[in-house]
C-alpha cells in the first residue's frame, strides 16, 4: 500500500513539474456512485457505493490526455476502498466549449473490511487489492478559459466484481 501511494504522489509531482503551457494541466474534484455486480459462491448481489476524490489531467496533445484519479468509496457493510485509476482519453470537439471523450485505462482498488460479528460468527479485519482495465466515455463542458465540469461513465470488469462507475467532476486548468 505504501509503495502504491508513493507512486501516486511521484506521478502527481512529475505531472505538475511538466505542465508549463496554459491548458496542459488540470486538477479537480470528482464524485458519484459505483454500482457493482458481485458473484461469489453462487450468490449474486448488486451493490451501490458512493465515492469522492480528486483527479489530475495532463494533455499530451490537443486530443490525447492522461487522467489520474483517486476515489475513496465510503464505508458500507463494513467495507471501504480507495480506487486509483489512470486513463488515456481522446478528446473530440463537439463545439467551442464541449468535448466528448472515450477512455481506456487501468485501476487498482485497495479494500479494507472491518472485523464484525453476525449471529455469533465473527470475521477478521482484512485488506486486499484488486485491479483491472476500465473502459468508458465522458463529456466535458468548459466554463470560461480555466474552469470546466464533466460527467463520465466507466465499466470496470473484474474490479471488485463488474463495476459501473458514474462520476461528476469540476476542475480548473492551469
Stretches found by the model and what they are:
Residues 78-104:
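Helix-adjacent hinge/juxtasegments
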Residues 1-24:
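Cleavable N-terminal export/targeting peptides
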Residues 25, 62-66, 95-98, 141-149:
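Repeated loop/turn-to-beta-strand initiation elements of outer-membrane beta-barrel proteins
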Residues 33-40, 71-78, 108-114, 144, ...:
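Sequence/structural signature of outer-membrane beta-barrel proteins
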Residues 57-59, 89-93, 109, 140-142, ...:
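Structural signature of outer-membrane beta-barrel channels/translocons
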Residues 40-47, 74-81, 96, 130, ...:
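Solvent-exposed loop/turn segments connecting transmembrane beta-strands
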Residues 19-60, 66, 72, 106, ...:
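Short glycine/proline- and aromatic-enriched beta-strand/turn motifs that initiate or cap beta-hairpins
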Residues 50-54, 82-86, 100, 131-137, ...:
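Hydrophobic, lipid-facing positions within transmembrane beta-strands of outer-membrane proteins
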Amino acid at each position: 500500500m505504501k509503495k502504491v501511494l508513493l507512486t501516486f504522489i511521484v506521478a502527481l509531482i512529475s505531472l505538475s513539474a511538466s505542465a508549463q503551457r496554459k491548458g496542459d494541466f488540470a486538477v479537480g474534484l470528482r464524485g458519484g456512485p459505483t454500482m457493482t455486480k458481485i458473484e461469489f459462491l453462487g450468490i449474486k448481489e448488486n451493490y451501490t457505493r458512493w465515492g469522492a476524490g480528486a483527479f489530475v489531467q495532463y494533455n499530451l496533445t490537443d486530443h490525447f490526455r492522461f487522467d489520474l484519479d483517486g476515489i475513496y468509496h465510503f464505508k458500507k457493510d463494513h467495507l471501504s476502498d480507495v480506487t486509483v485509476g489512470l486513463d488515456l482519453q481522446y478528446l473530440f470537439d463537439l463545439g467551442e466549449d464541449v468535448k466528448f471523450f472515450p477512455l481506456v485505462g487501468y485501476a487498482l482498488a485497495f479494500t479494507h473490511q472491518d472485523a464484525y460479528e453476525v449471529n455469533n460468527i465473527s470475521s477478521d479485519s482484512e485488506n486486499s487489492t484488486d485491479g483491472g482495465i476500465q473502459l468508458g466515455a465522458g463529456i466535458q463542458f468548459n466554463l470560461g478559459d480555466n474552469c470546466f465540469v464533466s460527467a463520465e461513465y466507466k465499466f470496470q470488469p473484474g474490479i471488485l466484481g463488474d463495476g459501473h462507475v458514474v462520476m461528476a467532476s469540476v476542475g480548473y486548468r492551469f
